[in-house]
Amino acid sequence: MTSKKLTPMMKQWHQCKEQAGESLLLFRMGDFYEAFYEDAVLLSQHLDLTLTQRQGIPMSGIPVSTINGYIDRLVSKGFKVAVAEQLDEVQDGKGKSEPLSRELQRFITPGTLLSSSLLPEKAHNYIVSINRVGALFGFSCLDFSTGSFLLQEYDNKKDLIDEICRLAPTEILSCDKFYKKHSDVIEQLLQHLKLTLSTYSDWAFEHQFATQKLSAHFKVSSLDGFGLKGLVPAINAAGALLSYLQDKLLLPIEHISIPKTHGNQKYLLVDTASQVNLELLAPLHDPQGKSSLLHVMERTCTPMGGRLLRNTLVSPFYDQKEILLRQDAVEFLLNRSELRKNLRSFLSQVRDLERLTTRVTTSLASPKDVGMLRDSLHASIRVFEVLSPLPLPEFFQGKFIPTIGLASLLDLLSKALLGELPLRISEGNIFSDDYHPDLKRLRYTRENSKEWLWDYQETIRKQTGVKKLKVCYSQALGYYIEVSSDLAPLLPKEFIRRQSRLHAERFTTEKLQEFQDDMLHVSDKLQMLETELFKDLCSRILEQREAILSLSQVIADVDYILSLADLAAEHNYCRPVVDSSDSLAILGGIHPVAQTLLDRGTFIPNDIKMHSTRTRMILITGPNMAGKSTYIRQIALLVIMAQMGSFIPAKSAHIGMIDKIFTRIGAGDNLSKGMSTFMVEMAETANILHNATDRSLVILDEVGRGTSTYDGLAIAQSVVEYLLFTEGKKAKTLFATHYKELTDLEKHCPHVENFHAGVKENGGQPVFLYEILKGHSQRSFGIHVAKLAGFPLCVVSRAQQILRQLEGPEAASRQNQEKVQQLTLF
């Protein structure tokens, strides 16, 4: 259809669609949001809606009353949605030569959700913007639902990718130039994350524009006061992000907080591969399962506390003071079970203060949201009241600032609002009768009109002395007072004559006219009044915005500590000694996840003792299924928990702070990059060798197994030697291996110690002890594991026959020769 033949309404649609770009446009038409052309086809396909046609144009629609649920479904499928609203009211009984006005008013994308069911309650929903200037990558990260705004720079792609994967955004923004030049970065991110890619103009990433955008938003003349001096690529990314949100997506940005630089100097770095291998946030083979460390540790009562726990789990502290402050606070609550019970009771009543405040700031709050804010403030102040009189540890001191402003706000909200509040302002019944003088009168008029008329009739009868006076109603006159003609002269002058009849006179009064006016428009008046009162109340809330956000952080801290204390109490955890020493000593350590999955008392505790001047590397041999991998993962998890400030499942522990944790555990083909299992293994190992330090913890499981025996052994030993003898790379290393030849290293290097997964034989069958014992393993029992896996018995028998041949005298002689060759490598 040419533009000349387009109806006025379709011309509006085309204008909005041009502005919407790649987004799916929902166009308000009366009681429906309609989609046209390709958008209609997509809407029909993905939401199972009927596809129709009008004048050959495909169209599909969604009822206005159900729009939010359908938008959520579209966004969950990766769509960006644009919404064009109808600005005019339909005029009843009047034709219009011009179409109703419409304009594009909002966009919804995966990274800009505010009040969607898709928002994870206890996780951030980030949108990330990336830019590069010279050798530096800059990125800005925003949780639009809370206003949290972070900036950082990196000098290499690996650290950039690891940090973005740690944050797990749902949307990434950059310019075409970046996407084309650094497609490898995007490919790697897409392997780990479910992402929507968004593109914005190159000019928005220019430094002058970005600086001006940020300065204007935060109302400053310089960004140096925010600690951003010299962070050119990060500033470029941040300014472009704000412009994208405000200028392209038409979103409010008033709630976005002053940006913070998100450095890693105070945090234990756990790279992306290690987060996955250690199953910190989700199980490897069951993303919805319960075998992650997060699931085990999660005891938080509030969304803010849950997000803090999740963030700290993937970025534990590398700062002794921060760790000790939290340990002291955990111990304080651990020893007070009744206090913990009371805190849980109050914290469970606190809703998402950050996101509620954002919805108020962006004028998207519902009455129900404000009611939840009121109830959350009340419960939060009760938390303060419970804790404030106590001899608090340092972590809590200074957090419970005077809450006079918030107490006043709470008092206002409590007096203003009814108990149960609606989702929409249009539903009414938001404010208490006493909050505004007109509320009571209008509601009384609406709900008690008959009683009011009867009372008014009796009142004026008494005032006038005319007992036969009646208050009546007609379609033509509305409400009126009727008396017989002979009694009319008895009425006061303020009675206004309306109509004369043959034997009667009809009057009205100002009060009756006011009642009639109220009755005719009472619902509209009530809605208008409550709408204005609600806007005013939200503005009063915003006066305390910063105080509410500070309160939110305090509640998150209390909830985090309470969660760790409850965890320690439930499982009888110990307080580890965490300091700057080179020690890693754990007595009776237990895998925190396995402990919860197995019956109490069935998990076998194990020890570890390492020190940079003594044992720096432990080689662990033994059969599969005997517990090697569980043990080495366990050590890493206990270190992470300890540096979160948590107590840990052990009898005792002394942990010198670790700066980085690396793992090389298992692998799979990466077909998208043309990488075999062995290539993935080698790439991950190379990353460890390049980035490990003397204070790192390295977990290696079967390095070198993906190639021939000689190649694999040579690679494994060279990796061991590199980590043992290279200055600056002498990390504490746990190396699980089937290469028995490596165990001879213990004889030649005092920093290497052999351990094995214990096995006893009973009637020729192995019994796994799940203990890690001193010395190396004598047998692998691989054929027995094959039998347990269901190999045909004939295959098992043949394997045993071949094994006996290989273990004969000639094989033994050959193995001795190989050992001599192996030692020369060392």
Swiss-Prot record:
GO terms for biological process: mismatch repair. GO terms for cellular component: cytosol. ATP binds at G622, P623, N624, M625, A626, G627, K628, S629. The keyword DNA repair applies. It holds the Pfam family MutS_III. Keywords: ATP-binding, DNA damage, DNA repair, DNA-binding, Nucleotide-binding. GO terms for molecular function: ATP binding; ATP-dependent DNA damage sensor activity; damaged DNA binding; mismatched DNA binding. SUPFAM superfamilies: DNA repair protein MutS, domain I, DNA repair protein MutS, domain II, DNA repair protein MutS, domain III, P-loop containing nucleoside triphosphate hydrolases. PROSITE patterns: DNA_MISMATCH_REPAIR_2 (PS00486). This protein is involved in the repair of mismatches in DNA. It is possible that it carries out the mismatch recognition step. This protein has a weak ATPase activity. NCBIfam families: mutS1, PRK05399.1. Belongs to the DNA mismatch repair MutS family. This is DNA mismatch repair protein MutS. The gene is mutS.
